[in-house]
Amino acid sequence: MNDFPWLTIIVVFPISAGSLMLFLPHRGNKVNKWYTICICILELLLTTYAFCYNFKMDDPLIQLSEDYKWIDFFDFYWRMGIDGLSIGTILLTGFITTLATLAAFPVTRDSRFFHFLMLAMYSGQIGSFSSRDLLLFFIMWELELIPVYLLLSMWGGKKRLYSATKFILYTAGSSIFLLIGVLGISLYGSNEPTLNLELLANKSYPVTLEILFYIGFLIAFAVKSPIIPLHTWLPDTHGEAHYSTCMLLAGILLKMGAYGLVRINMELLPHAHSMFSPWLLVVGTIQIIYAASTSPGQRNLKKRIAYSSVSHMGFIIIGISSITDPGLNGAILQIISHGFIGAALFFLAGTSYDRIRLVYLDEMGGMAISIPKIFTMFTILSMASLALPGMSGFIAEFIVFFGIITSQKYFLISKIFIIFVMAIGMILTPIYLLSMLRQMFYGYKLINIKNFSFFDSGPRELFLSISILLPIIGIGIYPDFVLSLASDKVESILSNYFYG
């Protein structure tokens, strides 16, 4: 066990520091904003320092582990630890949350509570990624939902209450299946509950019971990922939420579902995952085509980007269901890659809305001359989303392709068919992204607002855009940095399977 409680401090610090903000003056909007940014930067630096000096890349076992008895009556432990699977998502969470707080500068109504909720969400997300106890994972999973619901219901568009209610119904409803799975898997085979993930990974179950557990966890994670047909909350939520909240949703929240699929379904229930993986492969392939073909029909800019997220998550599902070293590594790389790209696109959509106050693409047009910096960044990041070589999306999708090709689980004819359908999805992606750029920035100037003058991207927006663009290009040029973090853990997970 680690001598110093690094992870406990990293998890508790944001929400504790955020609670102090509630005692700051009511009219101190700037104070609240800068205080929150300082907390996020300090948290990110603390996380980076702890990982740089304590994390060993060649060790697939749990590191920085902490194990404290929390509630004696329930025999409940506070177990924390990280490995190659969680370190990338934790660093991504810190980076995106810091930029999202900077993006939230225009928020003035109840800004103190808004920023507190962002910090509470930060703690819940890091807690989920670093939990080594199944019940603690569930508690952190639920803790993170409360601030998200409040952020969605209090700040956003006219239909924000509808979208927030839809979000909480989907996520809270699926959490019932998660809780049943947690209780079932921990109580099976012993009088005392076993909630330690390391012990549960070595446990075996009857086939029927393992399938039931797998389905319960799958429903919970499929809603968050999202996997079709449980995705319908996502476009509505993104369409109404404030763009800083959208950055957190696209950059981190969706990745929690994919993380859960690998951490619990794939690692704890390998036999059931082996049985369900062909179905997941089919669903992931359909998801790419469905979302890519639905996206061009969306008038709302943020809904179009939301459907692109659904399409890109399909590659993660395919990588996970390939049960190969390249496939799973590609899925993890896509989790990180899309975290940056999705957050960047929603930020740029939000900054565009701040200037023109329009969300419908058919009402826009000819903005390239008026806002050239935003146009340039939007174009570059759209290219990243359609997997342009040299960007992180390209290498992630290429590795997933390679994972399917090398998979020993599937017949050659089925692999050829899956790759063919995936290729069609990749062809459809430029269609909806390039048509989005054309409707926004090219053609005649359709915006007809009296006494309205555009102002281009300021230093804050430019700094944010470049900050997200740099890791996208960096990962695209040198993906080994991200792949090396998880490679040993991936091998450890796949050792439970008989092919790979």
Curated annotation (Swiss-Prot):
Coiled coil: none annotated. It is found in: Plastid, Chloroplast thylakoid membrane. It is a multi-pass membrane protein. Keywords: Chloroplast, Membrane, NAD, NADP, Plastid, Plastoquinone, Quinone, Thylakoid, Translocase, Transmembrane, Transmembrane helix. GO terms for molecular function: NADH dehydrogenase (ubiquinone) activity; ubiquinone binding. HAMAP family: NDH1_NuoM (MF_00491). Belongs to the complex I subunit 4 family. This is NAD(P)H-quinone oxidoreductase chain 4, chloroplastic. It comes from Arabidopsis thaliana (Mouse-ear cress).
